[in-house]
Swiss-Prot record:
UniProt keyword annotation of Metal-binding present: yes
Record-level GO BP terms: dimethylallyl diphosphate biosynthetic process; isopentenyl diphosphate biosynthetic process, methylerythritol 4-phosphate pathway; terpenoid biosynthetic process
Residues that coordinate or bind [4Fe-4S] cluster: 12, 92, 186
Obligatory cofactor(s): [4Fe-4S] cluster
Protein name: 4-hydroxy-3-methylbut-2-enyl diphosphate reductase
Function comment: Catalyzes the conversion of 1-hydroxy-2-methyl-2-(E)-butenyl 4-diphosphate (HMBPP) into a mixture of isopentenyl diphosphate (IPP) and dimethylallyl diphosphate (DMAPP). Acts in the terminal step of the DOXP/MEP pathway for isoprenoid precursor biosynthesis.
Protein keywords: 4Fe-4S, Iron, Iron-sulfur, Isoprene biosynthesis, Metal-binding, Oxidoreductase
One example GO MF annotation: 4 iron, 4 sulfur cluster binding
Catalytic residues, chain numbering: 122 (proton donor)
Pathway this chain belongs to: Isoprenoid biosynthesis; dimethylallyl diphosphate biosynthesis; dimethylallyl diphosphate from (2E)-4-hydroxy-3-methylbutenyl diphosphate: step 1/1; Isoprenoid biosynthesis; isopentenyl diphosphate biosynthesis via DXP pathway; isopentenyl diphosphate from 1-deoxy-D-xylulose 5-phosphate: step 6/6
Family: Belongs to the IspH family.
Catalytic reactions of this protein: isopentenyl diphosphate + 2 oxidized [2Fe-2S]-[ferredoxin] + H2O = (2E)-4-hydroxy-3-methylbut-2-enyl diphosphate + 2 reduced [2Fe-2S]-[ferredoxin] + 2 H(+); dimethylallyl diphosphate + 2 oxidized [2Fe-2S]-[ferredoxin] + H2O = (2E)-4-hydroxy-3-methylbut-2-enyl diphosphate + 2 reduced [2Fe-2S]-[ferredoxin] + 2 H(+)
Free-text comment on the cofactor: Binds 1 [4Fe-4S] cluster per subunit.
Organism: Campylobacter jejuni subsp. jejuni serotype O:23/36 (strain 81-176)
């Protein structure tokens, strides 16, 4: 059986930056998980004493706080600045971009449509920078019964599929006088999604490695599953089952943007140990 890695996979720029920052700072607390990968979070806690707190209210005697890659709300940032604590911002620059756009567009009188998952921490943070009105949607149908203003700005969660974002944009163009469109989908997301699409079309089994609470990993899995019925989403090599690979000729592997290489290599090693001819 051939084992092939996607052309683009794994750690993105924002995650690499955050991990490096956490390792250098040490002895700190992150507000929410730094990234969406439980194994890497455990490694940071064990080796660098970087612990994860649920929220700002959980801070007690910590001296250093790290803002997660997904960012935090504007209100939480203001609250954090009032505390006697050193702040290190690990928000991905691709996430900071829609925050800044929302703040500026609001000042100019635009209401904002955010294409994304309302419960995702990134989207919560972005929405908090809108001072007019924000509409968070996952589908154009959610906009059909809303009385839209004359001026709308549109941004996207960084991990969404571009074609779905364009469905929202095309709907708004037909419904309102002025639409300002900002492409806030991360370039790494484009590349990883294109790569897994290409690989899944020629594989008869796919393994996607990443946190099951990771939006970009789940998106990769959905693309793989669309093209390759026998696709599996795992967090560690412990979840692999030999029967997945029996009678298979081509195994494709990809990984989410928060998945470190050391986990991916463990997955590959275990698949090889199954000794599938």
């Amino acid at each position: 059986m051939i084992i092939e890695l996607a052309k683009n996979y794994g750690f993105c720029f924002g995650v690499k930056r955050a991990i490096k920052k956490a390792e250098q700072i040490k002895d700190a607390a992150t507000i929410g998980p730094l990234i969406h990968n439980n194994e890497e979070i455990s490694r940071l806690q064990k080796n660098f004493n970087v612990k994860t707190l649920e929220n700002i209210q959980a801070l007690s005697n910590e001296k250093k706080a790290i803002i997660r890659t997904h960012g935090i709300t504007k209100q939480d940032l203001e609250e954090l600045r009032k505390k006697d604590i050193e702040i290190f911002d690990a928000t991905c620059p691709f996430v900071t971009k829609p925050q800044q756009i929302c703040e500026q567009m609001s000042k100019e009188g635009y209401e904002v449509v955010i294409f994304g998952d309302e419960n995702h921490p990134e989207v919560k943070g972005v929405k908090s920078y809108v001072s007019t009105k924000a509409y968070v949607v996952l589908d154009k149908k959610e906009l059909q019964n809303i009385k839209l203003p004359n001026k709308i700005a549109v941004v996207s969660q960084t991990t969404k599929k571009p074609e779905h974002f364009m469905e929202i944009v095309n709907f708004l163009i037909l419904k309102t006088k002025e639409v300002r469109v900002f492409n806030t989908i991360c370039d790494a997301t484009f590349k990883n999604q294109d790569a897994i699409k290409e690989l899944s079309l020629k594989s008869d089994v796919m393994v996607v490695v990443g946190g099951k609470n990771s939006a970009n990993t789940k998106q990769l899995f959905l693309i793989a599953k669309t093209n390759c019925e026998d696709s599996y989403l795992i967090e560690t090599e412990e979840e692999l089952k030999k029967e997945w690979f029996l009678d298979k000729k081509h195994c494709g592997i990809s990984a989410g943007a928060s998945t470190p290489d050391w986990i991916i290599q463990k997955v590959i090693a275990k698949i090889k140990n199954f000794k599938i001819n």
